[in-house]
From Swiss-Prot:
Residues 1037-1056 are annotated as: Disordered. It is found in: Cell inner membrane. It is a multi-pass membrane protein. Residues 1043-1056 have a biased composition (Basic and acidic residues). It comes from Xenorhabdus bovienii (strain SS-2004). Part of a tripartite efflux system composed of MdtA, MdtB and MdtC. MdtB forms a heteromultimer with MdtC. GO terms for cellular component: plasma membrane. Belongs to the resistance-nodulation-cell division (RND) (TC 2.A.6) family. MdtB subfamily. It comes from the Bacteria. One of its GO terms (molecular function) is xenobiotic transmembrane transporter activity. This is Multidrug resistance protein MdtB. NCBIfam families: PRK10503.1, RND_permease_2.
Length: 1056
């Protein structure tokens, strides 16, 4: 059969070229699967990479940090420490609260961890105090993860205790039931209660003490089972008036009889409705509020969870009185949606730019249509695989697709360009398609699998970073694979039926001008290529110098972990002197809020003070600042934070720590700043000595700002020294003394009022409004022998001391967490090195262990693995190329293009003022896969010319460079323009995308300029080396054969 017959050639594409209906239906199936997958994909900011985290909170009002540590935290820690798969355990014990955070291995399902935690709590129950008012409560939530939704409930007409009651019963419970919600907390703490404030002098005058009041109320307000009885025909349930539900009932309660006359509770105490905890407060801007913070479960979908909550808000608002208002203060999904929409726009822009490049190079609208169909088809088809893999539409997967827009068109371009070349020579479209597709099939396979090989190491990255980029790598690999399938099936089929013979094509002026332009460029390139090939040593010097320059740039470029995002939210911690009172702290918080609201870029400010599960000490307050939308601001969050801190700098005795909220939360405890490290010692006294020394030294380092610690050992403590002998002689036990103190100063929960909707506590405390400071102890009385009233002051002395406000543990040992931010002109690498150098310079003893935490620890792990990751990518690609080419040499020639990309990427980052972070490293790894395409296309054609046409290596590589110049330039421009929207992005989340785009564009420009010359030179160098060793081996074999012949017995036979 004639070679031009359409029935010959075609390789793997042959079947699809000859069966257009089957090919079309196959592509429609891919398209439909992708569309269905896209509609079902969830939306999120980043892939779900959370550690399984559980927080256990135990409240014991009135207990000191020492008591909380020894009788609550320690028993629980011992049980939790036995759980298999526990990665890290931290705890914070403060006045009245114990918070333990358990972080599990990524491989452990959260539900399994939950069961183990519940079992551990049950095992520790017998060791916990009997009068613990609340059992330990666990939540499947990361405390460092900022709320996904913050609501403020306010009222000008109703008291906050009434508003809190409505919020608890009508709103918080309903929100908690939404799937994906991990924890709903109410900041402001105005839960209704009955407060009994006894007059110490009055009860002493009647020969009573506080314990009498407590036991009387406990015995008078009960609610227990009473049974039932059956009559002849009916059953009767028993009930009594055993519960006291009204204030008047408590006021009229008889405490004792003296001289036959009743002493009622109102005679010795003030009874009123109030808040269960008077030392909690929250404000929305400057208005008192109940603030609802909604946190998600680790791994939950933020968008779905928030949408479900928003859908029920109208119903919840309607359930409240008209005098009560509920407003949304923050919604993290607003910026997540905006960020995803920006990336989607950039994806469409990348596709448009790529199509434009194709048209400029191909000069044919019909030819341009073919790869233009391949791009969306490959990308849309990827959504189906993403859905089956459980991925989401997020910044990283959309970035992968945006980059893929430049990749996936490469295969189609190479196929079309090769087929068009045969059509230009006079071949019919069908014959050209079969011949061109058959010739280029192996190249497409080489390009595809070598590029996917680069992504393989990303799949084996460990821990959080590996989880983070797994979706990115698989999404990109799938898009590339689908692209190869489309390029070997649909593209040649469409070429065979849509492209016209050269004689039938009429080019317009633009197309003719572009053709002349490229012919001129190719002619210029050919002239320069001859010079380079004739003087190879200069080019080789440039090639090897780029390798050295890449290493130098890598060592000198600042290194970071993850780009700082501007999501329009700022988390803050306000720290005051450790001995500050609640009222004084409240004044400070309101003063700071008023100053912050004066900033033109601040939308609203939410603040909270007091001790509960989310805040550990009274001298620290939490802030959440919502900024105006990015398009309404002139500056970004990293410039706003110093300005806000400067605004409050003149407020005396307070320090404001601020950090922007990030989508990627690796930390597992609420911190003052972005980065943390922990000092851990077996002896607390060692930490007392070295923590202040290290903190003071770190404050002097220019690389660090906002250096702080959670070491709070300067709180005021009233130490009561009891004369045990005298107390024993008077018949007073230590239990009685502790109870008297707890009754007076502990806001003691002594009873509970049960209703069908809620439960309300009865709180006992001493009325100290007319007593200042330490004088309040003078009115504490006890009952001794013969029911005599004994003042506490007769058996004890009170001494003011300094003590701990909170006690922190890491893995059950005392620990202190240092917090810091990185100075604007410094990098995270420089900051970490500064911490290490400072520790060495002050002579930190070896028995104090330093551990970096959260993002800082992840940065160190990532930094240590960077070179291994790049090396693994290179080795993976070498193995794949070696298998494809059945050669040890040709893969080295192809990989010689890599240093040029590294130089371009690193130079672009340094010029742009960017750090080498995780995103940039991913960009460099992708460049490794892209730039080798140029070499593959050259070497494939050179080897074919040597093998099939008998050309010399010089002529073969020269002709290959000229023939493949246009597709090389076209594919590079397509990849470059695909990355350009990322480099130029300015919207929300642009901080994530820009480093990737800069790496890609910088690396592609540099590699395009250099590899067009270095690759053919290195090809010829290795060819000469191969021939040299081949000749040397042949000469050695010939010499060996000659020696064997010389020593053969035939040559030594005697003549006859």
């Amino acid at each position: 059969m004639h070679s031009d017959s359409p029935m010959t050639g075609g390789g793997p594409s042959r079947l699809f070229i000859l069966r257009p209906v089957a090919t079309t239906l196959f592509m429609i199936a891919i398209l439909l699967a992708g569309i269905i997958g896209y509609r079902m994909l969830p939306v999120s900011a980043l892939p779900q990479v959370d550690y399984p985290t559980i927080q256990v909170v135990t409240l014991y009002p009135g207990a000191s940090p020492d008591i909380m540590t020894s009788v609550v935290t320690a028993p629980l820690e011992r049980q939790f420490g036995k759980i298999s798969g526990l990665k890290q355990m931290t705890s914070q014990s403060s006045g009245g609260a114990s918070v333990i955070t358990l972080v599990f291995q990524l491989s452990l399902p959260l539900d399994v961890a939950e069961q183990d935690v519940q079992a551990a709590i049950n095992a520790a129950t017998n060791l916990l105090p009997n009068d613990l008012p609340y059992p330990p409560i666990y939540s499947k939530v990361n405390p460092a993860d900022p709320p996904i939704l913050t609501l403020a409930v306010t009222s000008d007409a109703l008291p906050m205790i009434q508003v809190q009651d409505m919020v608890e019963t009508r709103i918080a419970q309903r929100i908690s039931q939404v799937g994906g919600v991990g924890l709903v907390t109410l900041a402001g703490g105005q839960r209704p209660a009955v407060r009994v404030k006894f007059n110490a002098q009055a009860i002493a005058a009647h020969g009573l003490n506080s314990e009498t009041i407590r036991t009387t109320i406990m015995n008078a307000n009960v609610s227990s089972a009473k049974g039932s009885f059956d009559g002849p025909t009916r059953s009767v349930t028993l009930t009594t008036n055993d519960q006291m539900k009204s204030i008047d009932e408590y006021r009229n309660l008889i405490v004792a009889y003296k001289n036959g006359a009743p002493i009622r509770l109102r005679d010795v105490a003030t009874i009123e409705r109030g808040a269960e905890n008077t030392k909690l407060g929250a404000w929305a801007n400057e208005k008192p509020a109940i603030v609802i913070n909604v946190q998600r479960q680790p791994g939950a979908n933020v968008i779905d969870t928030t949408d479900n909550i928003r859908a029920m808000l109208p119903e919840l608002i309607n359930s409240l009185p008209k005098s009560v208002n509920m407003d949304i203060l923050t919604d993290r999904t607003v910026t997540i949606r905006a960020s995803v929409q920006d990336v989607q726009f950039e994806l469409l822009l990348a596709i448009a730019l790529v199509v434009m490049v194709i048209y400029v190079f191909l000069r044919n609208a019909t030819a341009t249509l073919i790869p233009s169909i391949a791009v969306p088809l490959s990308l849309v088809g990827t959504f189906a695989v993403m859905y089956f893999c459980g991925f989401s539409v997020n910044n990283l997967t959309l970035m992968a697709l945006t980059i893929a827009a430049g990749f996936v068109v490469d295969d189609a371009i190479v196929v079309i360009e090769n087929i068009s070349r045969y059509i230009e020579r006079g071949e019919k479209p069908m014959a050209a398609a079969l011949k061109g597709a058959g010739e280029i099939g192996f190249t497409i396979i080489s390009l595809t699998f070598s590029l996917i090989a680069v992504l393989i190491p990303l799949l084996f990255m460990g821990d959080i970073v590996g989880r983070l980029f797994r979706e990115f790598a698989i999404t990109l690999a799938v898009a590339i694979l689908i692209s190869a399938v489309v390029s070997l099936t649909l593209t040649p089929m469409m070429c065979a039926r849509m492209l016209k013979a050269e004689a039938e094509i009429k080019h317009n002026r633009f197309e003719q001008a572009s053709e002349h332009f490229f012919e001129r460029i190719i002619a210029i390139y050919g002239g320069w290529l001859k010079r380079v090939l004739n003087h190879p040593w200069i080019t080789l010097g440039v090639a090897f110098s780029t390798l050295a320059f890449t290493a130098l740039l890598y060592l000198t470029i600042p290194k970071g972990f993850f780009p700082l995002q501007d999501n329009g939210l700022i988390q803050g911690t306000l720290e005051a002197p450790q001995s500050i009172s609640f009222n004084a702290m409240s004044d400070k918080q309101r003063e700071v809020t008023a100053l912050l609201l004066q900033d033109p870029d601040v939308e609203n400010v939410t603040t909270f003070i007091g001790v509960d599960g989310s805040n550990s000490t009274l001298n620290s307050g939490r802030l959440q600042i919502t900024l105006k939308p990015l398009n309404q601001r002139d500056i970004r969050v990293d410039e706003i934070i110093p300005r806000l801190q400067a605004r409050v700098a003149n407020v005396p005795d307070v320090k404001l720590y601020l950090q922007p909220t990030q989508d990627l939360t690796i930390d597992t405890q609420v911190a003052r700043t972005q980065y943390q490290f922990t000092l851990q010692g077996t002896v607390s006294n060692d930490l007392n000595i070295w923590v202040p020394k290290l903190q003071e030294a770190l404050k002097q380092r220019p690389e660090l700002v906002d250096v702080g610690t959670d070491w709070q050992n300067r709180g005021l403590v009233a130490y009561i020294n009891v004369n045990r002998d005298m107390a024993s002689r008077l018949g007073i036990s230590m239990t009685a003394i502790d109870n008297a103190l707890y009754n007076a100063f502990g806001q003691r929960l002594i009873s509970t009022i049960y209703t069908q909707a809620n439960q309300y506590r009865v709180i006992l405390e001493q009325d100290t409004q007319n007593e200042a400071g330490m004088n309040a102890f003078n009115n504490v009385h006890l009952i001794g022998t013969d029911n005599k009233v004994v003042p506490l002051s007769t058996i004890a002395t009170v001494e003011q001391q300094l003590g701990y406000l909170s006690i922190n543990h890491l893995q059950q040992f005392p620990a202190v967490t240092f917090s810091f931010n990185v100075a604007q002109e410094a990098s995270l690498e420089a900051a970490v090195n500064a911490v290490k150098e400072t520790e060495r310079s002050i002579g930190m003893p070896k028995n104090i262990n330093t551990q970096f935490q959260g993002a800082t620890l992840a940065f160190q792990d990532a930094l240590g693995n960077t070179l291994w990751l790049i090396l693994a990518a290179v080795i993976s690609m070498y193995i794949v190329l070696g298998i494809l080419y059945e050669s040890f040499i040709h893969p080295v020639t192809i990989l010689s293009t890599l240093p040029t990309a590294g130089v371009g990427a690193l130079l672009a980052l340094m010029v742009g003022g960017y750090e080498l972070d995780i995103i940039a490293i991913i960009g460099i790894i992708l460049l490794i896969g892209i730039v080798k395409k140029n070499a593959i296309m050259m070497i494939d054609f050179a080897l074919a010319a040597e093998r099939e046409k008998g050309m010399s290596p010089y002529d073969a590589i020269f002709q290959a460079c000229l023939l493949r110049f246009r597709p090389i330039l076209m594919t590079t421009m397509a990849a470059l323009l695909g990355a350009l929207p990322l480099m130029l992005s300015t919207g929300i989340g642009a901080e994530l995308r820009r480093p990737l785009g800069i790496c890609m564009v910088g690396g592609l420009i540099m590699s395009q300029i250099l590899t067009l010359f270095t690759t053919p030179v290195i090809y010829l160098l290795f060819d000469r080396l191969a021939n040299y060793f081949k000749n040397k081996r042949q000469n050695r074999l010939q010499s060996q054969n000659q020696r064997e012949l010389d020593h053969s017995p035939v040559n030594h036979q005697e003549p006859l």
